[in-house]
Amino acid sequence: MRQIAFYGKGGIGKSTTSQNTLAGMAQNGNRIMIVGCDPKADSTRLILNTKAQVTVLHLAAERGAVEDLELEDVLLQGFADIKCVESGGPEPGVGCAGRGIITAINFLEEEGAYEDLDFVSYDVLGDVVCGGFAMPIREGKAQEIYIVTSGEMMAMYAANNIARGILKYAHTGGVRLGGLICNSRNVNRETDLIEELADRLNTQMIHFVPRSKQVQEAELRRMTVIQYSPDHPQADEYRTLAKKIEENTKLTIPTPIDNDTLEELLINYGLLGSEEEYKKVMEADMATQALTRATSINK
């Protein structure tokens, strides 16, 4: 059994990408379980064709304790017989969101949910790699990490941060980076940019997923593209990514870069102005504001 994880910043399309990819892997005959580790609990809805799955933490709070739950209470089966669990999180502003991940994984292990599987996939929020969110990495649960990113600055910043988290536990937990998945935002020279970032991080861009309205069309119906429109070219993109992950042997210890190097990369690809350009823009802004203030005073 291989344990993989999809990490990425919020809003990058991580859950959509992972569910479409896992649907392709399941169609190839793999027995799969998804463990959603995002407080939004949206890691399984396209597989289950539902709004949001009831989470382990929510049910545990209702029943009194996680020990009062049965496996069938939290584990549902969806498209292509993919098993689905959502760990959930606490009320906003209260407690640690990562606690749900730890609680859910421990419960699933104790209940034998990991038996007879080819892949377990963790779908994890990656804006911050705090102790709870890093749990699949830290405890060696996830052996292969796939980072969903794009050519946008904050997505790349998050990818580099996640690489730092992987490096921290690579020697103790045995976790490795499987590659970057570029979920395209139609940024100029996006393929080249992510390939260079991957090279700097000592990994590969395992696949470039083009932007397509078909993804949103399928999402409106709470389906993956593979289920909603199996003959569409976008479905083939996810099948290709699925095959690449199944056959991937390039698992590496990442080499994160510092923020200055990342900024330099963005400047080289024209996505960020140089320090001189930044100063000019700021000076122009200040001059405009001063002129506006002077005009309003004269009135």
UniProtKB/Swiss-Prot annotation:
Cofactor binding annotation: Binds 1 [4Fe-4S] cluster per dimer.
Residues with PTM ADP-ribosylarginine: R99
Catalytic activity reported: N2 + 8 reduced [2Fe-2S]-[ferredoxin] + 16 ATP + 16 H2O = H2 + 8 oxidized [2Fe-2S]-[ferredoxin] + 2 NH4(+) + 16 ADP + 16 phosphate + 6 H(+)
Gene3D superfamilies recorded: P-loop containing nucleotide triphosphate hydrolases (3.40.50.300)
Cofactor(s) required, per the database record: [4Fe-4S] cluster
Keywords: 4Fe-4S, ADP-ribosylation, ATP-binding, Iron, Iron-sulfur, Metal-binding, Nitrogen fixation, Nucleotide-binding, Oxidoreductase
UniProt: ATP binding residues: G8, K9, G10, G11, I12, G13, K14, S15
Enzyme Commission number: 1.18.6.1
Post-translational modifications: The reversible ADP-ribosylation of Arg-99 inactivates the nitrogenase reductase and regulates nitrogenase activity.
Binding site for [4Fe-4S] cluster: C96, C130
Disulfide bonds: none
Any one of the GO BP annotations: nitrogen fixation
HAMAP family, A to Z: NifH
Entry's family note: Belongs to the NifH/BchL/ChlL family.
Subunit-structure text: Homodimer.
Protein name: Nitrogenase iron protein
Protein species of origin: Gloeothece citriformis (strain PCC 7424) (Cyanothece sp. (strain PCC 7424))
Name of the gene this protein is made from: nifH
